[in-house]
Amino acid sequence: PWFGTWGRDTFMALPGLTLTTGDMVTSLKVIDSMVSRMKHGLFPNTAIKGTPAFNSSDAPLWFIRALQQYEKYDPDFDIWKKYGKAIKEVLEAYRAGTSGIIRMLDNGLIYAEDVNYPLTWMDAVVDGQLVTPRPGLVVEVNALWYNAVCQALKWAEKRDRTFFKSWSHFPELIRQSFVDQFWNQEKGYLADFAHGEFKDFSVRPSQVIAVSVEYSPLDPEMKKSILDVVQGELLTPRGLRSLSPKNEAYKGIYEGNQEKRDRAYHQGTVWPWLLEHYAEGVLVVHKNAGLGQVRKIFDEFEDVMSQRGIGSISEIYDGNPPHVARGSISQATGVAALLRINEMIEGFN
């Protein structure tokens, strides 16, 4: 085992690992444990030499999504009563700015930049340099931000009028700003990040999160177009590629020494955890008509579960066929994704 406890991954994996198996008690225990470690609206993402590193721009937003998922399994549970204070602390921290690294702009979007640390899941570093720098406005961070604000307002509407009045005008501002910043009508998909006047339109997978979230800033046609692009360039039987093979920076094989592997980690390598959001997006857009594709995605993993980590799936796979298994023999987010996809299928059945 390696990596240890990761704040972002904890909240990403929690619904799949606990809620789909009916383990509501563990789900809340983990959430409570993480909330006890929250500082200035942020969660520790890792511990570097024993010191917590609060260097995740989205872990608090995944926290709110985890609560959102929990409520679906226990609709009588009073989320706002127990976690309203923590939720407000998160949103106010983003709004006011956290240590000058993460802050809300006048257009309602979240801007995050730190030259010393990666702030998103694409976090490989070689010789002190980020392999996949994503400074400024990041697509999944702002999709999760919109979802978090909308969900918080729903919880607070009849419980916390002061908070509701203070935040009620933000969803439309954020939604319009998101579309203005990230959507390209001609290309038919979203920018991965925007920094100043520059927008990175490399075809990357994080945009599917903007399709899958409960509250999405996108209209149905945008969602369908994004899924078409992702299916055409990123979808494999093992997950979504982290970069399109059409991009000159694409690396289709994850091999070599530590440096070579790190340079390929988010530059074409396939990640199974992203399938949760792709599958959810397919069912959101196509409903029953998409069930066959989602079932195929799930069934594709049956054979590989008897390889490497028995009864599990690998952390990553090569971007190039035959998509050789790489990385850890099992990782929480990938396993959680398959559990959630299985439940999506059963839900439609």
List where the protein language model places each region:
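Solvent-exposed loop and edge beta-strand segments that line ligand/cofactor-binding
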Residues: P1-T10, I48-P60, D123, D127-A143, ...
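Catalytic cores of carbohydrate-active enzymes
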Residues: N45, R95, I102-L105, Y146-Y254, ...
